Amino acid sequence: MKIQNLLIIAIGILLISCREQKNESINIFICGDSTAQSYDTSKTVMRGWAQMLPDFFDEHVTIINKAKAGRSTKSYLAEKRWKEVMDSIQADDYVIIQFGHNDASSKPERHASYADYKQNLIKMIKEAKAKQARPILATSIVMRTFKDNALIDDRLKAYPAITRQLADSLNIPLIDTWLQSRDLVVMLGDEPSKALYMWIEAGIDSIRPNGSQDDTHLQSKGAVTIAEMVATDIKKQNLKDIATHVIIP
C-alpha cells in the first residue's frame, strides 16, 4: 500500500510539473522590416503588424519584435541583428522571418539577389533549428499599387514566390501574408484600401506633417488586420504550443 501511495504521489507531482511546463511562456521573435517593426505611438500613426500581434495571444505567449525599418536579409545579417536574436532565443521558441521589401531595393547595402536571398533565409532557418527553435517564413505584405482600378504589385518581384517555395521544400511553416493582404486589398478596392496604409492628410502625423500617400507602410487598422491574419494562420496550422493561445476577437 505504501508503494502504491508513493506511486500515486509521484504521478501527481509529474502531472503538476507537466502542467506548469505547458503554462510557461513561449516566445515568438519577429525578424523583419518596417512593415512589422514597432513605432512610438506618441509620434506617429504608423504601426507595424508585429506591434499589434500581442493583442491576439494570451499571457502564455510573448512577442519579441526585432523587426527594423530598412532591413533586408542581407543587412539584417550584416548588422548582426540576426545574431542578437540567436543569442537570445531558446529551445521551442518561434521566430517569424519576413523579408523581401528591402531585398528588392537597388541600394547596395540592402539588395540581395534572388540566389542570395534564398541562401540568407536558409542560413537563418538552419541556425534557428540548431538552437532547437522553430522558424516560420512569412511573405512580405502587398504593396498597394493601383492602376486603372486594378491592383498591380511588381515591386516585390519574385521574393514572395521564393519564400513560398523555400518553405515548401524545407517543410517550414509558411504564413502567406502577401497573398492574404493582396486578396484583401483587391476585395476592398483602390479607395477603401487606403485606410489600411499610410494615406493620411496633412496635420495628422508629426513625422509626416504634410501628409502621406504611402502604399507600403501601415496605419493601425492595417497593422491590426495583418496581425490577425498571422494569428489566424498560426491557429489554422495548429502550430505546437502557440496555436491554443491564439485569441481572435
Show where each model-derived region lies.
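Glycine/Thr-rich phosphate-binding loops of Rossmann-like dinucleotide-binding domains
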Residues: S38, T73-K74, S105, F146
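Gly/Ser/Thr-rich beta-alpha loop segments that engage phosphate groups in nucleotides
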Residues: S34, S72, N102
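Serine-esterase "nucleophile elbow" of acetyl-processing enzymes
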Residues: C18-K68, W82-A91
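Short, basic, glycine/proline-bearing loop/turn elements
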Residues: D33, K66-G70, E109-R110, F146
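Acidic helix-start/capping segments at beta-turn-to-alpha-helix junctions
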Residues: K68-T73, P249
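Bacterial Sec-dependent N-terminal signal peptides
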Residues: M1-E24
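Structural motif
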Residues: S72-K80
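Alpha-helical cap/lid subdomain in secreted, periplasmic
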Residues: N23, K80-V224, E228-I248
